[in-house]
């Protein structure tokens, strides 16, 4: 059986947690930041977690994580 390929785009975006979940970065924090409130930008800094329904898809893209 051949080795499975890791999806490199997913590898750069998702990190596996110790409990088996995946974390990623929030979106909407790259540009057009002047109209966004400080509290909104601060909350976007914290890591986001992947929804439970999306975990099988992420696992398929990251077979060795």
Swiss-Prot record:
Protein keywords: Ribonucleoprotein, Ribosomal protein
Ranges for region Disordered: 1-21
GO cellular component: cytosolic large ribosomal subunit
One Pfam family recorded for the sequence: Ribosomal_L35p
GO annotation, biological process: translation
One Gene Ontology MF term: structural constituent of ribosome
Superkingdom of source: Bacteria
SUPFAM superfamilies hit by this protein: L35p-like
Similarity-based family: Belongs to the bacterial ribosomal protein bL35 family.
Name under which the protein is recorded: Large ribosomal subunit protein bL35
Species per Swiss-Prot/TrEMBL record: Vesicomyosocius okutanii subsp. Calyptogena okutanii (strain HA)
Gene symbol of the encoding locus: rpmI
């Amino acid at each position: 059986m051949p080795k499975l390929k890791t999806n490199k785009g997913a590898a750069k975006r998702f990190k596996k947690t110790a409990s088996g979940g995946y974390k990623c970065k929030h979106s909407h924090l790259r540009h057009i930041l002047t109209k966004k409130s400080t509290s909104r930008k601060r909350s976007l800094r914290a890591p986001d977690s992947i929804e439970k329904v999306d975990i099988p898809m992420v696992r398929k893209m990251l077979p060795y994580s």
